[in-house]
From Swiss-Prot:
Acidic residues composition-biased segments: 651-689
Name the UniProt record assigns to this protein: Altered inheritance of mitochondria protein 44
Modification Phosphoserine occurs at: 25
Biased composition (Basic and acidic residues): 690-705
Source organism (scientific name): Saccharomyces cerevisiae (strain AWRI1631)
Length: 758
């Protein structure tokens, strides 16, 4: 279709300035270098038009073809009066404003005044030589003087104007006559006045053919004496509309030069619209007619090609009225019950018109409406078959949909066509979210029955109201129950009363019922482990901590643990009692002996005595102690030889040390051993204190004897220390002995490594 539309839109509404763009004008060029003959090329059309029609008069003021683009100013500041050879559709705003009057004085700006505005727009003035008086001449004289490709001269308005009153014979479809805006001023004047007031088109009255010809003759006689410079037209042509394009076509085809004596009404449109030949109205009306015809043709084609499953009447003897009634009934039934004609062959185009999506049948969506449909006999999770055939018996859908109440959501009107982007933005609620809404919820648009079949839900075979609402990806959004909505400017506006109409849904379902099988406290293992793990935080005395602090901490912790573990079995208590009694007796004796040794070595008196003993090797007691500790550490702690001559350290003690150290290493891995060891911390506090006192008395005397009897050959084998820290119990593979040193040297904490070599 050829329908003109505005190209530039950023303009002010009432004769305002262009906001972004200006066409090239005379104001931007040096004055007098270029005239409008060089700025436009419609003079070619003037010559061709004059040659074909043999026009005798100067017709520059007659048509928009000749005089529209050679108006007062080339500036585009007032977009209604010049376009410099371009179309200007910029100001199609209000067609009811009264046309302005132009007051023109020589060597002054052309002033445009309007009755409905206090503004006055000024056009660029054209300087003329002072001695030249302006004139008019017939087009025959001009043709002899000018070249065939030169422009017909156009005159400035300083007096009366000669205009011819005939229509523009550019085509058969022109519907405009050009009426003179200076019709009231076409009176013979003997005095050549320098100014002329042009009345508006509302003031200009239509005049008959005879009166206008008389006026033209008097004007030509008055202006014949004047010399002939180049002229410009400062007049804006007025356009008068003929009745309609139908009559104008017939009239112009009959005779080109015939004038219609019918009454002419002023065309109400803004002066910004300038179309060559005045064909804008014709093309707009033509476009409207073509649109109407195409719409009718489209409806006819859609009825022929995509008939809405009109079933043929079986008997051929029926009348036309019965056929029409049957067609209407069939259409209504089709929209109500069956969306697909089971008997007709379906093409992808027909499927698309009948609400198919990617060759999948629409009936899939009826099966996916779980709350609406009755529970089916087959309890299988619903799956979409991509090889679903169109032809299947009609009884299945009738059985499914006969006894079930219709949901208000399911509407069988043809769905709106949506683009891919609008489908992504569609405010759709999947049926999985509908099953999650409780039945008594006011916001739910589908009432959920209590006896919903558990296996027919879309997303999972388990039906639970507590699961998080997430959905599987569907084959197509049109196969899913959607909210009623309207698509306005490619945006979906929901029509439901839900407060939260759009629910964000992800790809899969998280069933929270599986998370509730375990209690929140005992979420990893059995309850016994939790009780044991709480008990496993038994306090182990650091090697350099005092015994008083250890005893206080153990008494406080053991009192709490006794209350918790009062109900344990008696057999395990007895076994753990015996084990811990043996374990604590050996460990406490070792730690006390180590402290005594270090205290004696650090003492100056004992160092002097011992240095005399070890004078052969020229090494201090500290070097010997370090050597023995390193050898003991590298020997994997299998044997400790600190107490060689002591009767307390027997073979049983060595085995018990190894076993007990392994027990401490594997406390969190082996729960039973941890319980036994921790329980006996409580029961043996009194025995520990007694044994420590006895051990101190015995070991101090024996240690002094051993230190006195040490020889250089026995140093590395006698002094060896093996200690296991409670921090080494996490992983037995990496649990190495930590040697206790004075607090100024090493401060042990949880952040230090498990094993240290000195």
């Amino acid at each position: 279709m050829i329908i003109r539309a505005p190209i530039r839109t950023k303009t002010k509404s009432f004769r305002g300035d262009q906001m972004d763009f200006k066409f090239p004008s005379n104001e931007s060029l040096p004055r007098g270098t270029l005239e409008e003959y060089h700025l436009n090329n419609h003079h070619l059309l003037n010559d061709v038009f004059a040659a074909e029609n043999g026009v005798s008069r100067d017709e520059d003021g007659n048509s928009q073809i000749l005089s529209d683009y050679t108006s007062t100013s080339n500036t585009n500041t007032n977009s209604g009066y010049s376009s410099n050879g371009y179309y200007s559709f910029a100001n199609i705003s209000d067609n009811t404003t009264s046309s302005p009057r132009i007051v023109i004085n020589q060597n002054e700006t052309a002033r445009l005044t309007s009755s409905d505005s206090n503004k006055s727009d000024f056009f660029a003035s054209h300087d003329f030589p002072g001695n030249d008086s302006l004139h008019y001449s017939s087009s025959s004289v001009v043709k002899n003087q000018l070249h065939s490709m030169e422009a017909i001269p156009e005159g400035n308005i300083t007096g009366s104007i000669s205009t011819a009153f005939q229509t523009i014979p550019t085509a058969d479809n022109v519907s405009y006559d050009i009426a003179p805006s200076s019709a009231s001023s076409l009176l013979p004047r003997k005095s050549t006045s320098k100014s002329a007031i042009l009345p508006s088109t509302q003031e200009a009255k239509p005049m008959t053919k005879l009166n206008m010809e008389k006026d033209i003759k008097t004007i030509e006689l008055n202006n014949s004496v004047v010399p002939k410079p180049k002229k410009k037209l400062n007049r804006v042509p007025t356009i008068r509309r003929v009745e309609s394009s139908r009559f104008s076509n017939s009239r112009y085809s009959s005779s080109v030069s015939s004038k219609s004596s019918s009454s002419r009404c002023s065309l109400k449109r803004s002066k910004a619209i300038r179309c060559k030949g005045g064909l804008l109205y014709y093309f707009t009306s033509l476009g409207i007619k073509i649109k109407k015809k195409l719409r009718k043709l489209r409806l006819v084609l859609r009825r022929r090609l995509f008939s809405y499953n009109v079933q043929k009447v079986p008997s051929a003897t029926n009348s036309k009225t019965t056929k029409s009634k049957a067609n209407i009934n069939n259409k209504s039934k089709k929209r109500g019950t069956n969306l697909v004609n089971k008997n007709s062959n379906s093409t992808p185009r027909q499927k698309k018109s009948q609400r198919y999506v990617s060759n999948l049948q629409r009936s899939i969506s009826s099966k996916s409406l779980v709350p609406v449909l009755a529970p089916q006999k087959k309890t299988k999770p619903l799956t979409v078959d991509t090889k679903f055939k169109a032809n299947h018996p009609q009884s299945e859908d009738s059985k499914v949909g006969s006894n079930t109440p219709r949901s208000p959501l399911v509407s069988y009107t043809p769905s709106l066509r949506r683009t891919n982007s609008s489908i992504r933005r569609a405010a759709s609620i999947l049926t999985a979210s509908a099953t999650m809404t409780p039945a008594n919820n006011k916001n739910s648009f589908i009432s959920v029955p209590d006896n919903v079949s558990h296996a027919v839900t879309r997303n999972s075979s388990m039906y639970s109201r507590s699961r998080l609402v997430r959905s599987k990806p569907s084959t197509a959004l049109n196969a899913i129950a959607r909210q009623p909505s309207i698509v306005v400017e490619n945006k979906v506006i929901p029509l439901s009363m839900n407060r939260y109409s759009i629910k964000e849904e992800d790809e899969y379902v998280i069933d929270t019922s599986s998370m509730r099988e375990l209690s929140p406290v005992n979420s990893v293992c059995s309850s016994d482990y939790d009780r044991e793990s709480s008990e496993s935080y038994s306090n182990y005395a650091d090697a350099m901590e005092t015994t008083e602090v250890d005893n206080k901490d153990r008494v406080e912790c053991n009192n709490e643990i006794q209350n918790v573990n009062a109900n344990n079995e008696e057999t395990s208590n007895e076994e753990s009692y015996n084990l811990m009694k043996h374990y604590l007796s050996t460990v406490i004796a070792q730690r006390i002996m180590l402290r005594v040794q270090i205290a004696r070595i650090q003492n100056n008196k004992s160092n002097v005595v011992y240095m005399n003993k070890s004078a052969e090797t020229n090494s201090t007691i500290y070097e010997d102690l370090a050597d023995t500790l390193l050898t003991e550490y590298e020997a994997d702690g299998s044997s400790s030889q600190i107490f060689d001559g002591v009767s307390v350290r027997a073979d049983e003690e060595e085995e018990e040390d190894e076993d007990d150290e392994d027990d401490e290493e594997e406390e969190e891995e082996n729960d039973d051993e941890e319980d036994e060891e921790d329980e006996e911390d409580e029961e043996d506090d009194e025995e520990e204190e007694e044994k420590r006192k006895e051990g101190e008395g015995r070991n101090l005397a024996k240690e002094v004897d051993e230190l006195a009897e040490l020889s250089p050959m026995r140093k590395q084998s006698d002094l060896s220390i093996t200690l296991r820290s409670p921090f080494a119990m996490l992983n037995s593979a990496y649990s190495n002995s930590i040697i206790s040193l004075p607090t100024g040297v090493v401060k042990r904490s949880l952040t230090l490594p498990v094993g240290m070599k000195i």
